[in-house]
């Protein structure tokens, strides 16, 4: 990642969207696959932190200084009424906490750092019952990003701009 940031992204970066993620195995309590959980955590929680850290020089040169992290409502403590999905939920909750800390650390430099829930999107990960076409989710998240201001930093929104409880 540092090589990419150093050799490819050599100029200003106005907006960074961290959107990589995996669902991990959905195991019942007592059947958790800890190797899969570690992999899921590495991708979903540590990956965005690594990318953002590597991109900071370019972001600091940018005019907008916006960083959006695609997370999930499933990483919300307040919204967890179903249980299960330990790897995914824990990794997204960890990402959410990292972004909250990041927003505090970067706010003095004029950064706006947010979390975005894309909705239940029609992708391989969303599965056959997902209700939201990917282009609609993307359009919505881009509208949210475009409307960000400093008061939004550290907050969690869905693709329609509605704040998600933590």
From Swiss-Prot:
Q: Which Gene3D superfamilies did the record assign? A: NAD(P)-binding Rossmann-like Domain
Q: Which UniProt keywords apply?
A: Cell outer membrane, Fruiting body, Membrane, Secreted, Sporulation, Stress response
Where is this gene product found?
Secreted; Cell outer membrane
Pfam assignment, any one:
adh_short
Keyword Membrane recorded: yes
Domain of life of the native organism: Bacteria
Q: What is its main location?
A: secreted
- PTM annotation, UniProt: The mature C-signal (p17) is derived from the precursor sequence (p25) by proteolytic cleavage. The subtilisin-like protease PopC is directly responsible for cleavage of p25 to p17. The cleavage site is probably located between amino acid residues 60 and 68 in p25.
In the induction comment, the record states: Expression increases throughout development, reaching its peak during sporulation. Transcription is inhibited by excess nutrients and stimulated by peptidoglycan components and the B signal. The csgA upstream region appears to process information concerning the levels of nutrients, peptidoglycan components and the B signal. In the absence of nutrients, a region extending 400 bp upstream from the start site is necessary for development and maximal expression. In the presence of low levels of nutrients, a region extending approximately 930 bp upstream is essential for the same tasks.
SUPFAM superfamilies on file: NAD(P)-binding Rossmann-fold domains
The Swiss-Prot or TrEMBL record annotates one GO molecular function as:
oxidoreductase activity, acting on the CH-OH group of donors, NAD or NADP as acceptor
**Deletion consequences:** Mutants fail to form proper multicellular aggregates, to differentiate from rod-shaped cells to environmentally resistant spores and to express development-specific genes.
GO annotation terms (biological process): sporulation resulting in formation of a cellular spore
Q: How is its activity regulated?
A: Synthesized as a precursor protein (p25), which is cleaved after secretion to generate the mature active C-signal (p17). The p25 precursor purified from M.xanthus cells does not display C-signal activity.
Task: Look up the record and report any one GO term of the cellular component aspect.
Answer: cell outer membrane
| CDD domains the UniProt entry points to | carb_red_sniffer_like_SDR_c (cd05325)
Q: Where are the transmembrane segments?
A: none
Misc remark: Overproduction of the CsgA protein has dramatic effects on the developmental program: the rippling stage is bypassed, aggregation occurs prematurely and results in the formation of many small fruiting bodies, sporulation occurs prematurely, C-signal-dependent gene expression is induced prematurely, and aggregation and sporulation are uncoupled. Reduced synthesis of the CsgA protein causes delayed aggregation, reduced sporulation and the formation of large fruiting bodies.
Role noted for this protein: Cell-cell signaling protein required for fruiting body formation, a multicellular developmental program that is induced in response to starvation. Necessary for rippling, cellular aggregation, spore differentiation and for gene expression that is initiated after 6 hours of starvation. In starving cells, the C-signal directly induces aggregation and sporulation, which are induced at distinct threshold levels of C-signaling. Contact with C-signaling induces cells to glide with high speed and low stop and reversal frequencies toward aggregation centers.
Q: What is this protein called?
A: C-signal
Organism of origin: Myxococcus xanthus
């Amino acid at each position: 990642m540092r090589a990419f940031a150093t050799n490819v992204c050599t100029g200003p970066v106005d907006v960074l969207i961290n959107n990589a993620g995996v669902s991990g195995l959905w195991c019942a309590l007592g059947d958790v696959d800890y190797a899969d959980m570690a992999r899921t955590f590495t991708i979903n929680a540590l990956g965005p932190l690594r990318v953002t850290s590597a991109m900071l020089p370019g972001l600091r040169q940018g005019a907008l200084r916006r960083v959006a992290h695609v997370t999930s409502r499933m990483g919300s403590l307040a919204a967890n009424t179903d249980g299960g999905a330990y790897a995914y939920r824990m990794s997204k909750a960890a990402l959410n906490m990292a972004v909250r800390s990041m927003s505090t650390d970067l706010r003095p430099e004029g950064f706006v750092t947010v979390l975005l829930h894309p909705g239940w999107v029609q992708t391989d990960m969303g599965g056959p019952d997902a209700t939201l076409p990917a282009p609609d989710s993307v359009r919505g998240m881009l509208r949210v990003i475009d409307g960000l201001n400093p008061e939004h930093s550290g907050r969690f929104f869905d693709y329609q701009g509605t704040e998600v409880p933590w």
